[in-house]
Amino acid sequence: MHEYSIACEIFEQVIETAKVHGALEVRHVTLEMGRLSHTNPEQLSFCFKAIAEGSIAENAEFIVETIPPSLECECGYTGTVDETQIGKNDELQSELLEYIAALECPVCGKNARIIGGRELIVKSIEIETEVEQ
């Protein structure tokens, strides 16, 4: 389960940033997770909370915002994947998106290259400092 090692890295970043800013407590951690990151948000959240026990991030709310894959086509189109392109109601097709190298361009119909959606970014950290108490 690679979610544990990812959660460890996120935890280290969060704690380091919180300490630099004099945090007494971490209230919220918000991540942007690409749909193609091959990371399970529920498992990542569970791992983060387990790692954070006994730390200033122990009670932090762990929020994951999903980023859709983005496309680029030789016709000049760039944009995000429309869920209807992959059969939103078909769970298997939706899961297979992680393994697809290209999708049909919504403008010209040719294969468009997937250029984004693999990100995993700590978007924001909300902390409590002594001044706020």
UniProtKB/Swiss-Prot annotation:
GO terms for molecular function: nickel cation binding; zinc ion binding. Zn(2+) binds at C73, C75, C105, C108. InterPro entries: Hydgase_Ni_incorp_HypA/HybF_CS (IPR020538), HypA/HybF (IPR000688). It comes from the Archaea. Keywords: Metal-binding, Nickel, Zinc. Ni(2+) binds at H2. GO terms for biological process: protein maturation; protein modification process. HAMAP family: HypA_HybF (MF_00213). NCBIfam families: PRK00762.1. Belongs to the HypA/HybF family. Involved in the maturation of [NiFe] hydrogenases. Required for nickel insertion into the metal center of the hydrogenase. This is Hydrogenase maturation factor HypA.
